[in-house]
Amino acid sequence: MELTQNPSVLELVRKTAELTTPKEIVWIDGSEAQLKSLRKIAVETGELIKLNEEKLPGCYLNRSDVNDVARVEGRTFICSRTREEAGPTNNWMDPDEMKAKLHEILRGAMAGRTMYVIPYAMGVIGSPFAKYGIEVTDSILSLIHIS
């Protein structure tokens, strides 16, 4: 199911899938039914633990993976056209150089996994201040936390 006919978004999803080779692509529609299904999968895989429904209805426990929570300064870069835009205390890299590095890292990265596509808005939809984006991930927890 695709939630958009926007050619730029569809091309981004196509290129990302071509690069990362997922077994399937799921578009997140934001529905309660889909969120419930994702929670069920996360409980089955052990990524979420359902808590006592009587004491804590609708609550789950998620333990962060120690290897997946901290930003590593040495591997965090500001990618802008000029080094000056990154500021004096940040690591900088040319965007084209970073894209080339990331393409190598991401090649086949979702093989055997599901690629989730999440459209989102930062701010009030329709506002002149709203910013719109697309997140592509294979992490069910990312989906649950963004919902």
Where do the PLM segments sit?
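An N-terminal JmjN-like helical accessory module and its immediate linker preceding a catalytic domain
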Residues: 1-140
